[in-house]
Design a protein with these regions (language model features):
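Short alpha-helix at the nucleotide-sugar/activated-sugar donor binding site of glycosyltransferases
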Residues: 74
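A short alpha->beta transition loop at the rim of the catalytic pocket in nucleotide-sugar-dependent
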Residues: 51, 77-78
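Nucleotide-sugar-dependent
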Residues: 39-46, 53-71, 81-91
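A charged, aromatic-enriched C-terminal amphipathic alpha-helix characteristic of glycosyltransferases
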Residues: 45, 103, 120-150
Length: 154
């Protein structure tokens, strides 16, 4: 995959339980940058300039979780590579919001190549923003919650 991506950079922005191990593994690897945690505004700028973002969840742990970085990326008009299970994978695939794959190094690498070369499923920046507004915004979530309450009262 690296040979097909040319001079592309892989930038990790953040923190977390695996941050130090990831930083150690990437030390000395050309084209990999580790940026410590930044403000939400700066993270948005990184996502807006990216070709794609990556979010993952290890299967069998929090399969019900929905990584909010997916929504932050889509709101910036940037496609997502999501490696993991659950509703997020279904949303990415069905909405053509990037690439959903297993948490597998080869599948993630192929997703990166596909989006970098423009061959991955992508609804476009405007379509991604519209999808977030229609399906995962506060307004959309409020409508869904109200429908559940109305149904329970009926």
């Amino acid at each position: 995959a690296r040979a097909r991506l040319g001079d592309a950079r892989l930038v990790f922005v953040g923190q977390g339980s695996g941050w130090e191990a990831l930083a150690e593994r990437s030390r000395g690897v050309a084209g990999v940058d580790m940026i410590p945690a930044v403000s939400a505004e700066e993270a948005d700028r990184w996502m807006a300039r990216a070709t794609a973002t990556l979010a993952s969840l290890r299967p069998g742990g929090y399969d019900y979780a929905y990584p909010t970085k997916i929504l932050a990326s889509l709101a910036q008009g940037t496609p997502v590579i999501y490696a993991g299970p659950g509703q997020a994978a279904r949303d990415i695939a069905e909405g053509e919001l990037g690439v959903a794959c297993n948490l597998d190094v080869d599948e993630v690498a192929e997703a990166m190549v596909g989006l970098a070369l423009g061959t991955g499923a992508w609804v476009g920046a405007g379509g991604a923003r519209a999808w977030v507004s229609a399906h995962r915004s506060v307004e959309a979530s409020s409508r869904a919650a109200a429908a559940v309450v109305r149904s329970a009262l009926a």
